[in-house]
Swiss-Prot record:
pH effect summary: Optimum pH is 6.0.
Domain of life, source organism: Eukaryota
Domain CBM1 stretches: 17-52
Gene3D superfamilies cross-referenced by the UniProt entry: Glycosidases
Protein name stated in the entry: Endo-1,4-beta-xylanase C
EC numbers: 3.2.1.8
Length: 390
């Protein structure tokens, strides 16, 4: 996840400061904790604080990892059918009927006791992505010591309910334990990456069909983001991770996933296409590109109107498939959601859409009301528009 951003040049500062849209805090962060003029350091989640323009009026709240509190348990005498089942009358079933693999959502272990949310997830969606419990800090907090309890709970729920699962994520610069960030030896980091990838994918082999092998590795100019992976290994970490993934589970589809890929001519979008083509030509087994699609409303810099051309451009890369992986839209405009759904329907390589949460109450952007269900778990106009359009 990431706040929607267009990277802009910032004025130089005498003291070290993070640039607009840069990181400015979070667990394990050792860089600048103040922002350049015109930006405010805003907590996105416990691990990531970001320099956002101006004040906090339109900034996302802390992620639900640390803030979410389950509502009182509610019982249902008539639980909805499993497998996204509703007699062909659910988002997932309608999307599949149009030739796609899935229409999915994001949940995590801290949602499992929320009966209202989970009933919607069970009824409407055919694919699940973990929000946080498969990230490195959750799965390997210390070297060689793995913890799978929370990730397992989500996998068990998904498999028992017939849901596809996207593994999110194997390598990410954020929510990364300090022991990994402290590595400065090439051979050590290579071994750590390979072991992390192989251990997770071995555990879930045959259960997870897509993996975001690397997540948010590009900067806004379309080059590699500065991270421990790029500092120690350069571009080689991409091949190391993908080759380890392919060797461990040859049947899983392997993705590179990023945000701000919502305009066909934006430098980051072009950089993604160029780098993926280069890496694939070098034998790196990248199967797909995931575009997160954390979108602004009309008038914002990355509205839904840019998605059709951007998705078509990404599909032009030398990959087998593309997917919209973390969709949410400021204000949840009905026309905006239909525009994004049609973009995927009109691109042959687009295999599916994942919305980043079930309801506005549980969204990392809850003050922007970006999802298909409101804070009381009632379907919104965007949901109804999608059902009618599909």
């Amino acid at each position: 996840m990431r706040s929607i951003a267009l990277a802009l040049a910032a004025a130089p500062a005498v003291l070290a400061q993070s640039q607009l849209w840069g990181q400015c805090g979070g667990i394990g962060w050792n860089g600048p904790t103040t922002c350049v003029s015109g930006a405010t350091c805003t907590k996105i989640n416990d691990w990531y604080h970001q320099c956002l323009p101006g004040g906090n009026n339109n900034n996302p709240p802390p992620a639900t990892t640390s803030q979410w509190t389950p509502p009182p348990a509610q019982t249902s005498s008539n639980p909805p059918p499993n497998n996204g089942g509703g007699g062909g009358n659910t988002l997932h079933e309608k999307f599949k009927a149009r030739g796609k693999q899935y229409f999915g959502t994001e949940i995590d272990h801290y949602h499992l006791n929320n009966n209202q949310l989970m009933e919607i997830a069970r009824r409407e969606f055919g694919q699940i992505t973990h929000e946080n419990s498969m990230k490195w800090d959750a799965t390997e907090p210390s070297r060689g010591s793995f913890s799978f309890g929370n990730a397992d709970r989500v996998v068990d729920w998904a498999t028992s309910n017939g849901k596809l699962i996207r593994g999110h994520t194997l390598l990410w610069h954020s929510q990364l334990p300090q022991w990994v960030q402290n590595i400065n030896d090439r051979n050590t980091l290579t071994q750590v990456i390979e072991n992390h990838v192989k251990t997770i994918m071995t555990r879930y082999k045959g259960k997870i069909f897509h993996y975001d092998v690397v997540n948010e590795i590009l900067d806004e100019n379309g080059g590699l983001r500065n991270s421990v992976f790029s500092r120690v290994l350069g571009e080689d970490f991409v091949g190391i991770a993908f080759r380890a993934a392919r060797a461990t589970d040859p049947d899983a589809k392997l993705y590179i996933n990023d945000y701000n890929l919502d305009s066909a001519n934006y430098a980051k979008t072009r950089g993604m296409i160029n780098l993926v083509n280069k890496w694939v030509s070098q034998g790196v087994p990248i199967d797909g590109i995931g575009t997160q699609a954390h979108l602004a409303g009309p008038g914002g810099w990355n509205p839904a109107s840019g998605v059709p051309a951007a998705l078509q451009a990404l599909a032009g890369a030398n990959v087998k498939e593309v997917a919209i992986t973390e969709l949410d839209i400021q204000g949840a405009g009905a026309n905006d959601y239909v525009t994004v759904a049609n973009a995927c329907l009109n691109v042959q390589k687009c295999v599916g859409i994942t919305v980043w949460g079930v309801s506005d109450r549980d969204s990392w952007r809850s003050n922007e009301n970006p999802l298909l269900y409101d804070g009381s778990y009632r379907p919104k106009a965007a949901y109804n528009a999608l059902m009618n359009a599909l």
